[in-house]
Amino acid sequence: MTNDPYHDRESITELLKQYNNLRSGHGSIFFEEEAFEKIIDYFDDQEDISKALEAAETAIEYFPYSASLLIRKADLLLATRKYREALEILEKAELFDGTDINLYILKTDAYLAMDMQDKAVELLELAVGHFEGEEKIELLFELADVYDDYEEFDKVFDCLKVILEADPNNEEALYKICFWTDFTGRNEESIKLHLKIIDHNPYNELAWFNLAAAYQGLKLYEKAIDAYQYALVIDEKFDYAYRNIGDAYIRLRKYKEAIEALEKVLELSKPEEVIYEAIGHCYDRMKNFAQARFHYRKASHLNPDDSKLLYKVACTYFNEGLWTSAVKQLESALKIHRQQHEYNLLMGECKLKLNEYKDAVQYLSNAVRIRPKNLSGWEALIRCLFVAGYYTEARQQALAALSHTNNKTLFLYYLSAVLFQMNKTKEALLYLEKALSTSPKHLRKFIQLHPPILQNPQVVDIIAQYKRASK
């Protein structure tokens, strides 16, 4: 038998007419409880809460011992934020029928609205013990939501675990526990739980996926990939499995395999910038800068306001020695985020490569100002000033770098190199000795800064002395 919408409308119209007659005292027709419920539902659907509440009160006059009508009234009172009144009605309803699950759900809503979390938790924990099957599971979900709202996240995981132990194929719980496993870090428990679920039903692709995600959380990437593959055998269009396989392969530095998995994601789902960016990252690591750039650009087209993608394109040009092309990308990135340390640093390096020293100094000074404790900014600025022949300024910046970075040895070497160029040999040798005695490993950068320094016999002698002493 099919539903007839026209007949339904005609029926409710007639019912409303009879109800209005009853309210005005002109009708003598007997109303069944179900008829009142239809009228309440009608006004509720029309979002006329006051009339719905009026209908509920009228219904209760005729059926004062109906738990379902009292619960309906309490629900409407909650909608009007009359929480205490709603609780009083629910207490009364419980006397007539304490087995209606809506009693506990609505009481919980009232307690939470009144910021009485402890009462809500106590009620639900008690109620869970009185119900079985689907109703128990519904209450456990409700309890999990309460724990979530009040940031008791381990207890959220516990609720979902209990649900899955009772109903291993519950999709909502399977989806949620994947997130909460990652959030709480309870990967070992998740592995045990999902192995049991798979033992019960080996064709549950969500259980395989969650098992894989838990392995991934423990950095057991090969095991994770195997489990994702099982999920894909069951559902070959499971795009999130391919996505996570791609991530696992990236962690294993198997970039070619990662690209294959991520390209499958693009086949199965709507294009996303994060996928194109990840593919670009893989090509970047494989030093295929043209392909990396191609995918970073695709990501950028999907999110033009993400300056980081423009920066990554610039890095590919920089790695190929295409300084001018890198500068163009960085100019665009800096228009979006001018105060990014990395953008200013790379722009300074590009300008240095192009022998545009004044611009280079400006950008590198910005980088240092933005992150004064970062070594790379100071290192690049002093190196730039040295290459440009601005030795007085280089000396000042080397001293400033030592002050800001807790006397990092690298800047003792750089200060020594600068002093040699300023013909302050005695002072330069003192700083070189101090640097060598503190950390010989940065000697390479000292020599890289100015290779002809090895033609100075005093420098060669000091280095030789420290090499002999370290043997």
Each model region followed by its residue ranges:
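Canonical positions in the second alpha-helix
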Residues: 59, 92-93, 127, 162-163, ...
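Structural marker of alpha-solenoid helical repeat scaffolds
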Residues: 62, 95-97, 130-132, 166, ...
